[in-house]
Amino acid sequence: MKKASKKEWYCKICGRFRSNEKFSGKGHSLHVCKDCQRKIQEEQHTKKLVTKMEKAKTYERLIPQVESLIEGVDNHVGALANVSALLHSSFQHYFWCGFYIVKGDVLELGPFQGDVACYTIKKGRGVCGKAWEDKQTLVVPNVLQFPGHIACSSKSRSEIVVPVFKGEEVIAFIDVDSEGYSAFDDIDKDELEKIAKIISPLFE
């Protein structure tokens, strides 16, 4: 095999020798040429699109299942437990999934799937408390950078918190954590907000 001269380098992906003029800062450190970098980026973009489509289809299948789980059920704790189990088992990016319920001036832990969690959260504290204060969904790509984040689990890296409303009043939250950064997007937001509306009668 030909050896690369001082003015050439070897791309680990395509196996071709490249001149120094082809280096980008990133490519130089990884020994990957610009052409291969571009192909990798295109493949990653395509993979993300496919993953988003699969996620949307999964949520689409889950909506009627959630409706079925709560229909005519008097055991509201059991119904919420089943909903959290259904969601948690349906997505690989769900590390923790459960509910926090408004009780006076705190949020109390409800049914969930995942590691042990905080029993109570005050308004304005952490992601859940901030979502309660703002009365809106919060999507946090990196919880380590979120001011006042409550680290119930050291594994959590990103989080989405969705309020459950009764009229204008927030009565509970769907809380989902992931071990990966930037795990949640607009699809998660839109679909979990739909689920929040479906389960709202359980809190009446």
Region roles according to the model:
Residues 94, 102-154:
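Regulatory sensory and allosteric helical modules in signal-transduction proteins
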Residues 18, 40:
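Cys/His-rich microdomains that often coordinate metals
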